[in-house]
Amino acid sequence: SGQAYRKSQNKKDSIIRSQIGFEIIGSKDEKNDDKEIITTSLKSLQNIKYSSGSLTIGNIEIFNLMISKLNIPKRWKLRLSRHFWREKYFNDLLERLETNSDVDPTIVEIDKKRYLKMLKEDLFKVVAGRSVNEILKRFNNKIKDPRGASKGKNVTKIIKEFLKIKCPINKAASELNNFFKKNKINLVVDQNYFPNSNNKISKLNVFFSASFGRQLEYYTGMVFKIDIISNSKIINCCAGGRYDRLISDLGSKKKVSAVGAAFNL
């Protein structure tokens, strides 16, 4: 337990929250451990008075798998996956894809002139935080893996439609599979992939949301939140998910899988 920094959609909310959490460090059985964290959260909820609420489940892994199948250059796939959690910047990236501003002939021609000029410069010279050598490598990648102007609009449409998917949890697999089939994306999701398939647990309605899980950068798989209504107020009382890279990102030389959750106090 202790204080944690959390961004909020409501500007009136404090970014510092007192929380009590629980986690499985060194998670070996992903699906069962994910389910265990949600089950523990639901058991803890029994001690709280509320009239109704919702359990929303998402999965970052599904988004990243879908992005990996889209017909866009590798650098764009990495960019979209990396910035999924930064909603405003992510939307800016989609706009660039949709309008093809990054492949505008005038801008490309200017870039080519800069490229030819930089070829004559010191490769170790630093420009805007990057060495000339790094900048030249990035430009070479663009030349070898160009993005067709006609593809951007269609890819953006697919991503936006995917992020709109929200349904009762027992329909999650069928909704996703219909979407993948419609857009000719080579992916299939089994309903057992999700930690729960019951649409109602106690007083909670259970949903799948494709866009949920963008609040924190470190989530890598299953994510969830529990919102309750108490005294006519909607309260986000619990949230959590899987973070298989966080411990190594913090300096561990060994990859340690983990999943956890926290209650707001």
Q: Where are the regions that the model predicts?
A:
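Intrinsically disordered or highly flexible coil/loop and linker segments, enriched in small
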Residues: 50-51, 90
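Residue-level detector of family-conserved "landmark" positions at structurally sensitive sites
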Residues: 55-58, 77, 190, 209
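Positively charged, Gly/Ser-enriched RNA/tRNA-binding surfaces
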Residues: 1-50, 102-265
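Charged, amphipathic alpha-helical linkers/stalks
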Residues: 46, 64-73
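Short, glycine/charge-rich beta-strand/loop segments that flank catalytic centers
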Residues: 1-7, 54-65, 83
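Acidic, His- and aromatic-enriched active-site or binding-groove loops in soluble protein domains
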Residues: 71-103, 228-230
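A short alpha->loop->secondary-structure connector
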Residues: 51-52, 74
